Amino acid sequence: MKELNFESGLVTYSINGACEVSFNPTDSNFVERLYSTFEELDRKQDEYKAQVEKLSDKREIFDYVHERDAEMRGMIDGLFATPVCDALFGNMNVYAIANGLPVWCNFLLAVMDEVDTTFAKEQKATNPRIAKYTAKYQKYRRK
């Protein structure tokens, strides 16, 4: 049987050397899930801050923090359809701060930057490639 192979745009990325994820950074379905997940996590971040400020008992705070950490890890793992959080964050809470932002935010912003960069690059490559094939097959067009 003959086999046809084509470029799907699927790219595998090593994330901080801890794990790998694969996605097509120009896939609108993935990008929509990425932005929806980011917005939901951002909303939960605001709720998290407000709730932690309300709680006074340390044990209640820690229980709440663990619950929210697990919830957010599930959302991030769901975005990539594979468990990535344990490898990326280990025992660190995803609300931990690094470079002024929660670590979950740093991770998703890095993915968003890759999406933006790749999309711009692919857009530039698309028009010349289409023109090349249009010219190639133009000679077969009936007049």
Predicted region positions:
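Intrinsic disorder/low-structure terminal segments
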Residues: 5, 12, 22, 79, ...
